[in-house]
Amino acid sequence: MLRDGNEGMSTIPGFSQIQFEGFCRFIDQGLTEELHKFPKIEDTDQEIEFQLFVETYQLVEPLIKERDAVYESLTYSSELYVPAGLIWKTGRDMQEQTVFIGNIPLMNSLGTSIVNGIYRIVINQILQSPGIYYRSELDHNGISVYTGTIISDWGGRSELEIDRKARIWARVSRKQKISILVLSSAMGSNLREILDNVCYPEIFLSFPNDKEKKKIGSRENAILEFYQQFACVGGDPVFSESLCKELQKKFFQQRCELGRIGRRNMNRRLNLDIPQNNTFLLPRDVLAAADHLIGMKFGMGTLDDMNHLKNKRIRSVADLLQDQFGLALVRLENAVRGTICGAIRHKLIPTPQNLVTSTPLTTTYESFFGLHPLSQVLDRTNPLTQIVHGRKSSYLGPGGLTGRTASFRIRDIHPSHYGRICPIDTSEGINVGLIGSLAIHARIGHWGSIESPFYEISERSKEVQMVYLSPSRDEYYMVAAGNSLALNWGIQEEQVVPARYRQEFLTIAWEQIHLRSIFPFQYFSIGASLIPFIEHNDANRALMSSNMQRQAVPLSRSEKCIVGTGLECQAALDSGVSAIAEHEGKIVYTDTDKIVLSGNGDTISIPLVMYQRSNKNTCMHQKPQVRRGKCIKKGQILADGAATVGGELALGKNVLVAYMPWEGYNSEDAVLISERLVYGDIYTSFHIRKYEIQTHVTSQGPERITNEIPHLEAHLLRNLDKNGIVMLGSWIETGDILVGKLTPQTAKESSYAPEDRLLRAILGIQVSTAKETCLKLPIGGRGRVIDVRWIQKKGGSSYNPEMIRVYISQKREIKVGDKVAGRHGNKGIISKILPRQDMPYLQDGTPVDMVFNPLGVPSRMNVGQIFECSLGLAGDLLDRHYRIAPFDERYEQEASRKLVFSELYSASKQTANPWVFEPECPGKSRIFDGRTGDPFEQPVIIGKSYILKLIHQVDDKIHGRSSGHYALVTQQPLRGRAKQGGQRVGEMEVWALEGFGVAHISQEMLTYKSDHIRARQEVLGTTIIGGTIPNPEDAPESFRLLVRELRSLALELNHFLVSEKNFQINRKEA
């Protein structure tokens, strides 16, 4: 936090800090906690004892670098070594060795892990916090029924409910419930202890009758009753130790372990003083919960809001990694026990290193990062996407909710989200409200809660102090909203300000305020904070904008925005795509692939990223920004990354736009653009595709990589080198061979060529045949080969020894069908590219670059794009850049409009262009039709907007099929571009054809053009000879499939075909 002249200001925390803190907490605390839980292992005769000495464990520095791990598809991990001892109790000897436990994947500087060469990230999960929660529901008679739900650390739930007679029941499943007295007795309390520990003993005494008193007379009877209700399948159980163990395993371990957080919550809610290390549910907890429930029945106490963030906890990367480490140690324990028993059985002398295997830990983490729903492949479309992905929070995942069962109340915005979870940034579709994004200043506290910073207002001290509050603490304070940040301190005593108190938004005097917000962006996520004039947009459009900025493609020539919010620099810095100087010094040498820095007597070579492919096929590239001989300081930018300029985020381009209709080409969100954007490479981007092939060892022999491929034209093999692999720099077209490969196979005698059969008969030479299994370039993949990698995994399986990867770069200009969007949810598809001379032009002759539909603004209520458009024009003419904080109306009324108009007026005066600011229609100007030169009827809003090109491109979506594969069951074309699928005539298409009465077209669409196998084959022959296509004589395959499916339901369907010649009904069997 800054002091003195900048008192009251703070720096924004690192956007990847949550991931770093979580991983450091796992390494510092989680590893040690789980290792301490590892038990001493003894054999059955208790002669050998194995134990780990966890105080001196070691994590070894990785043997490979991050770049090599990605290149060779390896895991960037550290080896874990722990001293272990094997004690022989008979001779009192101990053998101590350092054993290798396994590999733990490390986190890199981006806050991600590299597993099998793929960047993966673990996102935070929001779960219901363990503890007890009271709620009230109306029964069918309209009477309030009070229940208390106890949630364990594992997510198991048990309910306490009170009936009309004030009797309390414990419901351990949906169907079974038992008396609270039976449950307390089964947990170890007698009736006297129960009555001594409750506030309403007379109510508890009224529960049991004589039969129930017998059940709670002893602990054995209570356990039998509880077991019979909860776990018994049938018969009369008999009390035994095995019965107690089964009940302990089925019920108490799953539903009664509260954990560290649950114990804290239970103590706070029920005013208990049970020690924190006692993490299991005790009879005292149950009785206190029952007392509280009785108080609820009598109108005392408050109900709990299950959706309040104080009742939620964050399962961070530290918790998830610690859970997996504990699971791996349990597997290791079982493996060590089995190895000890096997060694003794075979009379072998074990050693610690022989007993411990690294497989459990390594395989557990590999399966976690590869299969767990919360471990996701890092989205690297652009720099913004990388940092936003690590700050996601999800209600989904193991132990959480599902998209189909979550209610609207859970998805909705809650007042406790203020400053913690962004109210705007969430996914669209079925997961809306379930996957959110953390606010900029939010952090995860020690107890798994989301904390938000506030400035404390103190009359005694003039110093401003920043405090982080959890959701349970800030309810007790009057918190002033962010608009009070700009008020003059001298007038504040007389001001009335909006504030938040106990989930309500009030307007109170300044002297009653306890805390105030620290930053106007405090409530928003990173994506929403990059939207200028966000306060003038509808929240739905702001949501779309924050999502679409993550889909922006890095352009070949990036340009920073004229109108921004000021967070562009921080976002680019924390994304890690720019090269930053770690030491001060002098630039000795600079090149496209490295920068050499000299300082303090050392020379450091800093490698740059060159044309690296992201997992969304976008191009990641670094461009040097320093010259040779220049002196730099620590933290200075050496090279810009993809979509950054001068260390600022630059996702799009500032283009001249007009809001007007144009011959219908921009109706319904279509966009008309100038050919200047194509020929000037304004929206040109590079995309890198990866194609790979593996060589296997088959039963007939190994596959061969070669350039001698029989039966293929030389034209297709023109780009292969002598090894059979495509050469670097080659231009590749669809269908060309990238890697030549032959797979050996045995052939039948009849399939041999005559000369091969002669060789076999005369000389006895075995002629080997091979099948061509080359890697060919698929449709739409044409481009330039920029990299070829031949990877041989060390110690790999002989069945998969080699892998060849070919990387092909495509240069894509903007074209009809591509999707573009602004930063205000204004998206559209390119409908037509006009010559620049036909585009509307301004009064100074400048042609417009894009034409948007003005009808897309009022109905969608995203007026922020108009402010940005006009201010961008003023900034372009004045050569200025603006950084606008949101909610600038806190300074004065209509502050945004006054700013825009004043800048337009300044631009009009300085450039001597009166059309820039016309008083009768400010922000609008008369423009001319490029085809005729005539002015349009009405003035039009023109300006400079920051427009993004999105990853939804027509080259990836357009698809056509002349012939292809058919589904085996229905005999209809497959579905989807990836399978070379086609269209099929469905139910609604048939209705459309029937509506026009086109009987013959309907027949051919449903028979030989679709799934009639025999008629489909006859079409080709009759077309070649020029005959007429015969009408099919039987039913198509889909109808036959319907008949068979009805038969499987024991329904026989007979059908009849009517002949055209004599209208005679002929019965046919399907």
Curated annotation (Swiss-Prot):
Compartments where located: Plastid, Chloroplast
Reactions it catalyzes: RNA(n) + a ribonucleoside 5'-triphosphate = RNA(n+1) + diphosphate
Domain of life, per lineage: Eukaryota
Entry keywords, A to Z: Chloroplast, DNA-directed RNA polymerase, Nucleotidyltransferase, Plastid, Transcription, Transferase
Cellular component annotations (GO), alphabetically ordered: chloroplast; DNA-directed RNA polymerase complex; mitochondrion
PROSITE patterns to which the protein is assigned, alphabetical: RNA_POL_BETA
EC number: 2.7.7.6
Record-level Gene Ontology MF annotations: DNA binding; DNA-directed RNA polymerase activity; ribonucleoside binding
Major enzyme class: transferase
GO BP terms, alphabetized: DNA-templated transcription
HAMAP family in UniProt: RNApol_bact_RpoB (MF_01321)
NCBIfam families in alphabetical order: PRK00405.1
Protein family: Belongs to the RNA polymerase beta chain family.
Oligomeric and partner information: In plastids the minimal PEP RNA polymerase catalytic core is composed of four subunits: alpha, beta, beta', and beta''. When a (nuclear-encoded) sigma factor is associated with the core the holoenzyme is formed, which can initiate transcription.
Function, in words: DNA-dependent RNA polymerase catalyzes the transcription of DNA into RNA using the four ribonucleoside triphosphates as substrates.
Protein name: DNA-directed RNA polymerase subunit beta
Organism: Liriodendron tulipifera (Tuliptree)
